[in-house]
């Protein structure tokens, strides 16, 4: 996930935060020699887990690999992987173009697959007193419409919540099991009606922790900020639940990654909130994008995500209640919600 807030870097970091350095066997793409040196220098200076790498040895191996594209690629991949905990990446110019195009197509609603339909059929029917919203992965496409894309997606998620909020809901399920990452900010703003517990003012819902002071994620009635900087804002106050502060059950799984894990952490520590399912992917760290001299880019992992209480280690997030199957996870979440005082007797 993203710390650097310049729009192009932000867009690229959100887009590629879960990708690893890889190349087709037929054509190995590599940074230029100058860019390779810059890449290693940047990793040694700024990467979150830079102390895990013997940098003189890594440079010696890179030098010995000259003339062998496969070995060069493998050395760079190892340097990035070890110093980022598996969350960083090198992106060629061509790959940035192709992935931006692919991501643009991927923002359309996905068709329901046979496996999705089977899982839905096996899940228990929800009690009508419980609302549900699925916050899936979402990446913005680099360009001048980045802010608009974030606003539109956040507004869409808030509308899903609003349309279910008849006044009879005594609890909600936030399903993050399929959230493989992307841009966390529209996710947090989209679920703000459930995330926020106050009507006015700012709420700190998490942070990025670096060697310096933490950078807090702040939810306002209309948007999201990183520290004092506005990341995305709807322009007017977003939707507010008819019964604010109701119990929320959070569903997680091994596909919940990166921005998805940021969303889990934002909800963790919220009053009347409990998580169910399986541990997350384990990349709850934040990325920035650093352009290199040849036009390619380094997705650089620089900080750890933490919840509103300062808890977080960059590793897998374990749910409060471990459940394995989709049906068992939904059933456990529903049982807990219905046992809460907000639902009792309603």
Predicted segments with their positions:
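C-terminal "post-core" interaction segments
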Residues: 29-47, 136-139, 167, 176-346
